[in-house]
Amino acid sequence: MYLSDFLYIVPEITVLGSALALLVLGMFTSERRVRSMSLISVAIAAVLACKELIYFSGEEVSLFGGFVVRTAHTCLARAVVAVSGLFAFLLFFFAKRSYRYEFAVLMLFAFLGTLTLVEAHHFLSFYLSFELIGFASYILVCFNRSSIKASEAAIKFFVLGALSSCIMLYGISLVYGYASEFSLGVVSKVLGGEESLGATFGCALVLVGLLFKLGAVPFHMWIPDTYEGAPTVAVVFFTIVTKTAMVLVFAGLMQGVVIPITGFVWSMLLMAALSMVVGEFSAMQQKNVKRLFAYANIGHIGYVLAGMSTGVVTFKPVLFYVVTYLLINVWIFTVLLRYDDEGFEITDVAGLAAKNPFLAFTFVAALLASAGLPPFSGFFAKYTLLKAIGGVDAFGVPTLVCVVFLCLTSIIPCFYCFRIAKVVYFDVPTGEHSATSRNVGLSIMAFVAVTLSLVVVLLRERII
């Protein structure tokens, strides 16, 4: 281990130092100031991570005795996660919510976990990062102690999360028993040479833990209740930061460790199809807005799994899809954060066009982008992913079936998006819940998200 190794993890050191400092300073300063300082530390980390990506030489470097490996994939993943974290903290900063200062500190610790997770190259650092995200997330969900729904959601999340962590840890022990090594690079070489029942089962258990965090069917049970009960700011973090990190980590494992074991490919394709069907059809039946988006995100995970299951060639389209929907989710949450944390039903946006035409247009446009209708960015993301999956011949009929499922389930979001649009423009206001007063910060965030979505679409040929 050399001192130069620490230069690579300066973004992580910045976030960790800020979290520890604010944990103490929060007792002597205002919550607003803690929120501002946490945003500054995340912005610094994002700038440093992007700088590391820009100046990356392309040479693979092992750091801290193999616990961290600097590659093109890890540098790119860390930069994407850091920028997503910056978006999440900006939304947190502009949202007119009053939380205790520990909320910002917990978000910093969870953000630190996502940064270390995407660059982990050792099962020990991988699992510790996984748990750091988990423990911070459990507390964020139940932060509103007076809410029964939040407490119920946190208990479900904690119990199922603990179970998934145990399963993952058992899988890691099985893989170690076969490969006699915790390094992901060595494990991938061993599994690529010869398969065994023990190693295959161990990899499957490790993937179960990740699939739980992703919310793929049949490991999605915690998602709807957690989204409904948790503070909206926490949901923002889970959707924008945690999901992005988990997808990028899962993509790395699929390419390096799992793809050589061909039996996993069929399982991934099956879970992709189930996630698309269950997510989109369940979203049609929801009345609560946050539950609806929870199921919609399950459907999006199905699309991502379909892309990753077909091999290395489709990673860039998956990355394009993830970045595009990251920006769309930022766009959507600039509207959702104007409403109360609890009891946000679809009927609460009735007549929004009459009260706030700009907000109504922003909300409906974001929904149409999420549904994947042209000419919005979501359409190009789904089309690019579909084109990439359809161009892979290695897996024959299962891939064809997955393409059919993707096409059919892409139509379903139009139903509930147009239903919400109808409520926004034509229904009579109920008056029970209404959006908070004009929020210039969130409006600017919406404009930035739309602009970046347009830029990403225009530059998609270079990205892919």
UniProtKB/Swiss-Prot annotation:
A single GO BP annotation from the record? ATP synthesis coupled electron transport
| Record-annotated membrane-spanning stretches | 6-26, 36-56, 75-95, 101-121, 123-143, 157-177, 197-217, 231-253, 257-279, 293-313, 317-337, 360-380, 395-415, 439-459
Top-level EC class, please?
translocase
Reaction equation(s) it catalyzes? a quinone + NADH + 5 H(+)(in) = a quinol + NAD(+) + 4 H(+)(out)
Which keywords does this Swiss-Prot/TrEMBL entry list? Answer: Cell inner membrane, Cell membrane, Membrane, NAD, Quinone, Translocase, Transmembrane, Transmembrane helix, Transport, Ubiquinone
Task: Return the EC number.
Answer: 7.1.1.-
Where it sits in the cell: the answer is: Cell inner membrane
Q: What domain of life?
A: Bacteria
One Pfam match: Proton_antipo_M
Q: Which GO terms describe its molecular function?
A: NADH dehydrogenase (ubiquinone) activity; NADH:ubiquinone reductase (non-electrogenic) activity; quinone binding
The entry's cellular-component GO terms read: plasma membrane
Q: Does the keyword Calcium apply?
A: no
Give the membrane topology.
Multi-pass membrane protein
Regarding protein family, the annotation reads:
Belongs to the complex I subunit 2 family.
What is the stated purpose of this protein? NDH-1 shuttles electrons from NADH, via FMN and iron-sulfur (Fe-S) centers, to quinones in the respiratory chain. The immediate electron acceptor for the enzyme in this species is believed to be ubiquinone. Couples the redox reaction to proton translocation (for every two electrons transferred, four hydrogen ions are translocated across the cytoplasmic membrane), and thus conserves the redox energy in a proton gradient.
Q: What is this protein called?
A: NADH-quinone oxidoreductase subunit N
Q: Which organism is it from?
A: Anaplasma phagocytophilum (strain HZ)
Encoding gene per record: nuoN
